[in-house]
A protein has these predicted regions:
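Periplasmic N-terminal accessory/gating domains of Gram-negative outer-membrane beta-barrel systems
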Residues: 1-39, 44-46, 50-88, 150
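Outer-membrane beta-barrel transmembrane strands
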Residues: 221-265, 334-383, 428-459, 515-525, ...
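Transmembrane beta-barrel wall of Gram-negative outer-membrane proteins
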Residues: 119-152, 156-195, 227-245
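Acidic/polar loop-and-plug regions of large Gram-negative outer-membrane beta-barrel proteins
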Residues: 180-236, 262-343, 406-432, 606-609
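Signature of Gram-negative outer-membrane beta-barrel scaffolds
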Residues: 341, 367-535, 648, 684-685
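Surface-exposed extracellular loop regions of Gram-negative outer-membrane beta-barrel proteins
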Residues: 198, 202, 412-427, 470, ...
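A beta-strand signature from Gram-negative outer-membrane beta-barrel systems
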Residues: 70-116, 127-129
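Gram-negative outer-membrane beta-barrel transporters
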Residues: 596-601, 618-698
């Protein structure tokens, strides 16, 4: 529960805008099943590609699609094209879990005025939307604008609120019959209070599974400590070439994403954990019905139990008054030093994209599509001091490093260079950066092409893609735990003792400042789609693909907030997938039946957590994760005698399993030393693993 933006096991909410295609299964899976966190074919969310004006929008760092960038702009982003599974599209090679291209240009928005008011959403109490599009005027110009507001929260989770807005503006000019140039600018700024997961003990004590530990009363009002704040505008410049012959058409798009994305959280130093559901604040900390338990204090247990069961605000929620009081009483010569503050963890992207796509029809039975794309991304990760909570200043030191290295003042510094220049740790005012600050750099280039052949009712498509990816970390601060070498190439020392740490495997100094090794990957992929249209709306088709992809930045660095260490033995991810389908669409009836098989090899996963067995915060990295996804899908829509009313249903059955036991690397976060005695030999066995189990020799 330490990260507000945690992966959540590969699940990500998918808005209905992505599933407005003529496919019953995907429509229901994307909308009706989103509340139960359904994953199509068991795939993780980054496997779904989403394009904006021909530019792939999947996040350069995580691979996920940033749906929130256009959230609330439904009318402006309604026009789109989609394909399922491993099908090949006219606007991109895609992956193995479908591809959607949203067209947010002025001429793509439906002509006229549109407005709406909604009051029954699970996320907010009120939504207002207004959109206007001129359509193409006689002078060749088109323009459109849209605005929205979504306000309120919900009534069943206390402390949660939602304030989100959206704005969109686009102009487009047609020059003659062959050329068109358009510009679009849009964003969805907003903020929302978050809910936090807790433990079953807390839910039982409160009698409420919707309990939220993130809030408390301050000056008589509800205040949430964890608030997501975003404003990331997107600017798009798109050129289209459509000659009268229609044998050759092309488009070129430049897209730039920028702005800020952050969320707040409590931070503290030399003070008790302020979270109400921290384990030391619960009854079970004082007494458990266990003969081996060594903290038996029934009186404190009874007091804590009563406080929780009666919902005593100072116990069950953040006690803001106490935090302010502690800060105001911590007087020093420089003023009141805050022990509790609000931090904002920022992830600010600069993402520049260029894409060219072309379509060629040399003969009636052949269509050739292809394209080139390039992505330049620099994302800055850092923290800023958002609120001193009544104090005058905060100090930029690492309290977790201080626990292990209190005798080494240089090693507890978050900014060692500042300490060496000034002889003291940096004092912080509101708005200052602190803790960590680094760039994630990503460069990605891609070329793809496809050929579609049609003969009567038979259709065949073959496609290929070549890609190149490179990423690296650039630390902007020198952390005392991992100083690396000084400007003269010498190790750092304290009182004659070397404090520079060296990698246990390759012997190189571990650094936090400057550029890491640059990891690059060359990938190649191929697809084939075969289909046959039978009379009367019947169709059978099959898809197959072999896809290689580079790992993402966030699955490559073991602890990017502290150091430049890259996960050992990084490999491309290899996916082999195939499906066979029957579809029927006629007279209001729609049916699709699919059988699918997917094998994924060499995934990686990186996580950090406090390991009780080691009594330390650790980094846990796994490589060589293999998966298999096998199953069937059925979707149907049947008209009823009542006009505009149909019966819809879906069914799926699948087996999604791990087919390998990965290699694990576990390191102490404060020292980068390996927990396991030998590098890379510890293999965690999946619980109830259906394929690989330990033999008698282990």
């Amino acid at each position: 529960f330490s990260e507000f933006d945690m992966d959540d096991s590969g699940y990500q909410d998918s808005p209905t805008i992505l599933f407005g295609q003529n496919d019953v299964f995907n429509n229901m899976a994307g909308y009706n099943f989103s509340s139960v966190r359904f994953r199509v074919r068991g795939y993780s969310s980054e496997s779904q590609d989403v394009y904006l004006a021909g530019v792939r929008m999947n996040d350069a760092i995580t691979g996920y699609t940033p749906y929130s960038l256009w959230s609330g702009l439904n009318e402006a982003t309604r026009s789109k094209e989609s394909v399922n599974g491993a099908e090949v599209s006219d606007f991109g090679f895609g992956g193995y879990n479908g591809l959607t291209n949203i067209m947010p240009m002025a001429s793509s928005v439906r002509t006229g005025w549109r407005g709406s008011v909604l009051t029954n959403s699970a996320l907010y109490r009120l939504r207002l939307m207004l959109t206007y599009a001129s359509g193409q005027l006689d002078n060749g110009w088109s323009y459109a604008f849209s605005a929205s507001a979504r306000l309120g929260g919900n009534d069943w989770i206390k402390g949660v609120f939602y304030r989100s807005f959206g704005y969109y503006g686009a102009v487009e000019k047609r020059f003659g019959e062959e050329h068109k140039l358009g510009f679009t600018f849009m964003a969805a700024p907003g903020e929302r209070g978050a809910q936090n997961g807790s433990t079953q003990e807390v839910y039982d004590l409160m009698g409420d599974n919707m309990y939220n530990s993130n809030w408390g009363y301050y000056n008589g009002k509800v205040r949430n400590a964890r608030v997501r704040k975003t404003h990331e505008p997107i600017a798009i410049l798109k050129y289209d070439f459509t000659p009268e012959s229609q044998k050759l058409s092309a488009s070129a798009t430049v897209l730039y994403r920028f702005g800020k994305n952050g969320y707040t959280a409590l931070d503290w130093y030399d003070a008790p954990d302020p979270r109400p559901d921290y384990y030391r604040n619960l009854p079970s900390y004082f007494y458990m019905d266990n003969t081996d338990y060594n903290r038996r204090n029934f009186a404190k247990y009874a007091w804590a139990k009563e406080a929780w069961e009666t919902d005593l605000p100072s116990t069950t929620h953040i006690n803001w008054d106490r935090l302010y009081a502690v800060n105001s009483l911590n007087s020093t010569a420089s003023g009141n030093r805050s022990k509790y503050v609000i931090e904002e963890r920022r992830v600010d992207q600069n993402d520049l994209n260029f894409a060219v796509n072309a379509k060629w029809n040399p003969v009636k039975f052949l269509t050739v599509n292809g394209g080139l794309s390039y992505k330049w991304n620099r994302t800055e990760y850092y923290k800023i001091l958002d609120d001193l909570l009544g104090g005058d200043y905060y100090v930029n030191i690492d309290q977790f490093a201080e626990r292990d290295f209190a005798a080494y003042p240089t090693m507890i510094q978050n900014d060692l260079d500042y300490y060496l220049r000034n002889g003291a740790a940096q004092t912080l005012a509101q708005g200052d950066k602190y803790g960590y600050d680094y760039y994630a750099h990503v460069r990605r280039a891609e070329a793809w092409a496809s050929g579609r052949f049609t003969f009567g009712g038979f259709e065949a498509t073959v496609a290929g893609r070549l890609g190149y990816s490179k990423f690296w970390r650039e630390g902007l601060l020198r952390k005392g735990l991992f100083p690396g070498l000084d400007d003269n190439g010498n190790p750092f020392t304290y009182n004659g003792e070397i404090i520079t740490k060296y990698d246990q495997i390759d012997g190189r100094p571990i650094t936090s400042k400057g550029e890491s090794d640059k990891k690059d990957f060359l990938t190649g992929s191929g697809k084939i789609n075969l289909g046959y249209f039978i009379s009367g709306g019947h169709r059978i088709y099959a898809d197959a693909a072999y896809i290689t992809e580079a790992p993402t930045f966030n699955q490559a660095f073991i602890s990017p907030r502290t150091r430049n260490t890259v996960m050992p033995d990084l490999k491309t991810i290899k996916t082999l997938t195939a499906d066979i389908n029957y579809a029927y669409s006629n007279s209001g009836y729609d049916v699709r039946v699919t059988g699918f098989y997917t094998s994924i090899k060499d995934r990686t996963d990186v996580m950090s957590f406090y390991d009780d067995s080691q009594n330390s915060f650790t980094n846990f990295a796994m490589s060589g994760i293999d998966e298999r996804h096998v199953g069937v899908e059925l979707g149907f829509k049947v008209p009823t005698p009542v006009p505009n009313l149909s019966l819809q249903g879906v069914f799926t059955y699948g087996q999604y399993i791990y087919t390998s036991n990965p290699t694990m690397y576990q390191t102490y976060d404060n020292s980068a030393e390996y927990v396991a005695g030998t590098y890379g030999v510890v293999i965690p066995y999946w619980k109830s693993h259906p394929v690989h189990k330990k033999n008698d020799d282990g």
